[in-house]
Amino acid sequence: MRYLLLTLLLFTVPAQAQTTLRLSGLTGELEANVQRYLDRYAATEISTSLRFQSRLEQDIGTALQALGYYHSEIDISLQRNGHNGSRLLIRVTPGEPTRIKETDLQILGDAQNDADFLVLLAQAPQAGDIVHHGRYDSFKAALNSLAQRKGYFDARFSLQRLEVAPSRREAFVRLHFDSGTRYRFGRVSFSGQQIASDRLQSLVPFQAGAPYLASQLGELNQALANTNWFSSILVTADTEEITEHTLPINIELAPRKRNSIETGIGYSDDVGARLKLNWLKPWLNERGHSLNTKLAISGAEQSVEAAYKLPLQSVATDFWQLQYGLRNRDYQDTRAIESNLALERHWLLANDWYRTASIRWLYEDYTQADQEDSSSLLMPGISFSRSRQSGSGMPRQADRLLLGIEVSDPSWGSDASFVRLRGRAGYIDSFGDRHRMVSRLDAGAILMETVENLPPSLRFFAGGDNNLRGYAYESVSPLNQQGELIGGRYMATASLEYQYRVTGNWWLATFADYGSAWTDSPDWKRGVGFGVRWGSPIGAVRIDFAWGLDAEGSPFQLHFSLGPEL
């Protein structure tokens, strides 16, 4: 019976009423900083005791003084809510702020004439500013950070003082920053590499004796990673060998495996399942030659391609590439076997532009609608391209541009005379953390009277995952009298897509596509729909449900794709 009575008593004891806080009288940064202090209290710490109220006043005063308000008035009153607990009402009047009356800012040592330090000095606390302890500390941290990035490794404050006279509402900032001597790059040594040292030295973006700059070590690390030659890269400064403020750089490398095989799978309502195999030999010899072989198989198309890359002395910017590809296509009204052999010369230009000069031989045996023929073409060409992005998977910002031209003429052995132009553009931008816009343009033109003498691979078709959603793969083009696709002289498509982040790397998308492929006059097609995006480490996984508003037959298409969005 005693146990039953004890249990009943336990269940009838009322829960302890809690005390809450309510702040008023402040706005903006003052309110936010005080609220940060208040948010540190656990619910069990808050009480109506005079001891807690005294602590509360102290903390609020500290929060306001950090922003230059030393003469605040804090009024705390108690509001009881019956059995629902009580509330402390905190009314704050910040008062007049304390301002900086005088500053004494000096840069000493080699940095006194450094342009970056002069720019940073312009961001220092100035006379007339409200005292802000956070900005004062941030400015000191910025000086130290800049010094480390630019090689002033002996930098120190010979004087650092923030003097506040609350009674006079005045403050004085005194900072003397002695940078000392700026260090310089010494020799760069590689170890563990399988590539000739002279090739690696061409990647070094600085000369021995040049002023130290941390960003250039980052550039060197990225350039080494971009070669695909190494599985690990460790860049360190040899502090034991410093002489006369010269800093040697040691780079420890580990070779990448000689063979790398990647597989992939995809599906779309256009061509069904797609299988991909990529066999990469990232380095074949000490000169850094590489071989990349790709195999792609779907119901509509099977292809194999091999590319042999020969870096030149400037490894990061110049290389030759010999390429051969074989492709079989059987889809819609196209049946073709094509063989491509190309020799390309690549240059990296300023502002991330690539220039590629090429000469390509194409032999294609084909049936396009009711036309059966074969073609042998020798086409010199040149293209300019640029691709940039910030982040991976689903980059916050990205842009891609491509402009290219190929020319063919019987005077050098081709079966036809024409000029073929191609252009692509894409742009990604983000707004906040949840909104993205993706836009794409794709266009092409063939300068000749008729495309009947051209193989299908050079004619233009529209429709598919990355071109004109809502229409089957390459299903939009001029038709012959039997209603069969024959390809066009021109093509233009545009896409605008909005994405909303649902959670993590998952996004919802809605889009509208517009475009056509034509010879005489365009028959514009519209496609709309929605989709799901997942930002995987290797690129966006995209599933789209699309409707062709001008499609004949079934207007619905399911599109699935994996990889970069542009």
Regions found by a protein language model. Name each.
Residues T367-Q371, D415, E449-F460, P522-W524:
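Outer-membrane beta-barrel and related beta-rich outer-membrane complex signature
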Residues T12-P14:
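N-terminal signal peptide c-region/cleavage motif recognized by signal peptidases
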Residues D433-F511, A517-T519:
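Extracytoplasmic gating/loop element in the C-terminal half of outer-membrane beta-barrel translocons
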Residues L401-D409, A416-E449:
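Transmembrane beta-barrel strand/turn architecture of Gram-negative outer membrane proteins
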Residues D110-D116, L213-L402, D429, M437, ...:
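Gram-negative/organellar outer-membrane beta-barrel architecture
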